[in-house]
Swiss-Prot record:
Its biological purpose: Hydrolyzes diadenosine 5',5'''-P1,P4-tetraphosphate to yield ADP.
Organism encoding this protein: Burkholderia thailandensis (strain ATCC 700388 / DSM 13276 / CCUG 48851 / CIP 106301 / E264)
HAMAP family: ApaH (MF_00199)
Enzyme Commission (EC) number: 3.6.1.41
UniProt protein name: Bis(5'-nucleosyl)-tetraphosphatase, symmetrical
Entry keyword Ribosomal protein: no
Protein family per UniProt: Belongs to the Ap4A hydrolase family.
Enzyme class: hydrolase
Gene (UniProt): apaH
């Protein structure tokens, strides 16, 4: 997407169907009409108003840049008959909506990564061996595969934990699966980039030998600002080249947004409480 505004974008954490909290935060921010709005994935699921949330973001048109999160992909997988609804899911209202086909098509055409103004947005994270160029190349491969006529077969093959680490020698299906898992699922990895998918607590809960993906030594995206969500137990975290946005709104905590000024010291945080957007425990 090319810039159509000189205003810095505002990036929102995982909405997960918390429509009222999003509307409250949007009103608090009161962005100018040409301010780009970024969404770090997981627009839907577990919150009480997934359909209204999705329709609202779709209605923003090209102003909205939303990357795919694991819950958005779960919506696609259920719509495609690859997965079934799970306890706590709130995407059934989307699937039953009269405009369901249009909404599913919109989600299916979202990117896995977005790079603009020296900032790279993904849902979950990146592997240490990837620089920004390789991450965008892999995101493009995934995006093109999900936009193709055989997207259902492709999506079915993306689910799975193996292989759990990157190699430039990976063949097509394995290459896409590793990228899929890094972009949408990763929290912890080894210093060498082997992913772990069970632990979902904060950084202190890292299994032995693992660390948060963004603390992997020699991470090749350390020179760009990475914007991401996904990790509610991590919470809002700002470093010079890191913006973590998921502060657990759907769990009754807070919804966060950050105005992404080019100067890290000028970035502005806005939050609202989410007491009325509590999801059932997993």
């Amino acid at each position: 997407m090319t810039n159509f505004s000189s205003s810095p974008p505002i990036a929102f954490g995982d909405l997960q169907g918390c429509h009222a909290a999003y509307r409250q935060l949007f009103a608090q921010l009161s962005p100018a009409a040409d301010t780009p709005l970024w969404f770090a994935g997981d627009l839907v699921n577990r919150g009480p108003a997934s359909l209204a949330t999705l329709r609202e973001i779709v209605g923003l048109g090209e102003r909205a840049v939303a990357v795919l999160g694991n819950h958005d992909l779960h919506l696609l997988a259920v719509a495609a008959g690859i997965r079934t609804l799970k306890p706590g899911d709130t995407i059934g209202e989307i699937l039953d909506a009269p405009d369901a086909d249009d909404l599913i098509e919109w989600v299916r055409h979202r990117p896995f990564a977005h790079f603009e103004r020296g900032m790279l947005m993904v849902h979950a994270g990146l592997l240490p061996q990837w620089d920004a160029a390789l991450a965008l190349e892999l995101a493009d491969e995934l995006q093109r595969a999900l936009r193709a006529p055989n997207w259902r077969d492709t999506l079915r093959g993306l689910y799975g934990n193996d292989p759990n680490c990157w190699s430039p020698d990976l063949k097509k299906a394995d290459r896409l699966r590793v990228a899929f898992n890094a972009f949408t699922r990763i929290r912890f990895c080894t210093p060498e980039g082997a992913m772990e998918f069970r632990a979902n607590g904060g950084p202190a809960s890292a299994p032995a030998g693992y660390l948060p993906w963004f603390d992997a030594p020699s991470r090749k995206t350390a020179d760009v600002t990475v914007v991401f969500g996904h990790w509610a137990a991590l919470g809002l975290m700002l470093r010079e080249n890191l913006v973590a946005l998921d502060s657990g709104c759907v769990w009754g905590n807070r919804l966060s947004a950050v105005r992404l000024a080019d100067d890290p010291a000028a970035r502005e945080v806005a939050q609202v409480a989410c007491e009325r957007c509590g999801a059932a425990e997993e």
